[in-house]
Every structure is written in C-alpha cells, then in structure tokens.
C-alpha cells in the first residue's frame, strides 16, 4: 500500500454510488472476515469450509497442544460464550457459571485468547489509568469469520439479529489494526459510548449504528 495514495484515499469524500458498490463487500467481510485463504475463496461454501478448517486446526488442535491446556473443553465453552456476547461488558460471575472456570482461570484463558490473536480486549476509558485496569472489559474478535464459525452462523448481515454486534466488532478490529487502544466509555447510569480513541492528546468518541 503506497502511503501517500492511502492518505489521499482516507481524505476522499465517498459518493453514494461508491458506497453502494462497497456495501456488499463490507457485508461479506462482516460475515467471513479477512483471512487471505477465505477472502480468495470463490464461493460461500468454500469460505465456510476454509474457516471451519482454520478453527479445527488452529484453535481446537494447535493452540491447545502448544500451550498444553488442561480441561480444554472449558476453553471451548469460554470462546463460545465470548462469541455470543461481543460488545457486552464482561460479567465474570456469569462466565464462571457457564464455563466452570474460577476468576483467576478466566483471566488466564482470556489472556491466552488475546495473545494468540483470536480476541481483543476493550477497556473502559478513564482518566485514571489504574482504574481502567480494574474495571470490567468488553471482548471482541480480531476476525469476524472466526467468530461466526464459533457460533455456526453465516447468515447474511441483513438477516442477522446481531447486526449491531457485527458492526461494532468490525470497528473494534479496525481500531486495533490502526494501532490504537480499543476502549469504551460508560457512566454509572449506564449511558455508553461504543469507542473512545486517544489520538495525539485528543479524545475522540465513536458511536456505531446498524441502520
């Protein structure tokens, strides 16, 4: 990607015809993600097969073997639970009940999912950085296709009940890819801003809409 051209592209005002041409590709990305082999697959069936193979070899086999994870079924339960609640603030008590993991084991397994580039964590924005670390995070998936493989749902975006979560997950992943920390903001009365980006000393709030 040539840097100067990319900067020009970022400053372009997208016209409606361009947006309409782009939308089908965006919707497909929200369902199948961006793994190269998946993106290059010609049909939906082929994309789904490749994603299932990635899940079965990378997650179900390699990660568990390399890290020598005991009681691996609990990790599978955890990733399923996280996939079903992307964009929601983590409730550790609920996750413990679902997975059978205690609080310490939960944190350990969530760290593993981050370090193996499966999930990413969104911390609550706070001016006191120490406070950020002790508050409950949200969890997203770096690749939407991997997440949809976990929950076994490849329906088109237009037919999805979790459309808002798919868009929010896309935004979280792109923010992370651009080198920013992924954070959200929430008041005690539960008013919320989806993302807060700290850029060159400025704080930029971002709200994701699905309509």
Spans of features found by a protein language model:
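Amphipathic alpha-helical segments of the small helical/lid subdomains adjacent to P-loop NTPase cores
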Residues: 1-34
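Accessory nucleic acid-recognition modules appended to NTPase machines
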Residues: 39-203
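Active-site ExK catalytic segment of metal-dependent nucleases
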Residues: 202-211
């Amino acid at each position: 990607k040539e840097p100067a051209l990319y900067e020009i592209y970022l400053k372009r005002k997208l016209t409606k015809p361009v947006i309409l041409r782009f939308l089908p590709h965006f919707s497909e990305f929200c369902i199948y993600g961006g793994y190269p082999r998946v993106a290059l697959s010609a049909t939906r069936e082929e994309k789904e097969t490749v994603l299932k193979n990635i899940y079965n070899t990378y997650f179900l086999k390699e990660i568990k073997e390399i890290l020598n994870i005991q009681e691996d079924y609990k990790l599978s339960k955890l990733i399923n639970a996280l996939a079903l609640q992307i964009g929601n603030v983590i409730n550790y008590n609920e996750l413990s009940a679902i997975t059978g993991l205690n609080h310490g084991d939960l944190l350990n397994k969530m760290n593993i999912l981050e370090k193996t580039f499966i999930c990413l964590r969104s911390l609550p924005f706070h001016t006191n950085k120490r406070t950020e670390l002790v508050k409950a995070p949200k969890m997203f998936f770096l690749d939407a296709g991997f997440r949809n493989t976990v929950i076994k749902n490849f329906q088109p975006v237009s037919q999805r009940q979790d459309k808002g979560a798919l868009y929010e997950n896309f935004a979280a992943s792109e923010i992370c890819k651009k080198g920013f920390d992924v954070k959200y903001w929430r008041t005690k009365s539960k008013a919320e801003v989806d993302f807060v980006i700290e850029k060159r000393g400025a704080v930029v709030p971002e709200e994701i809409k699905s309509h």
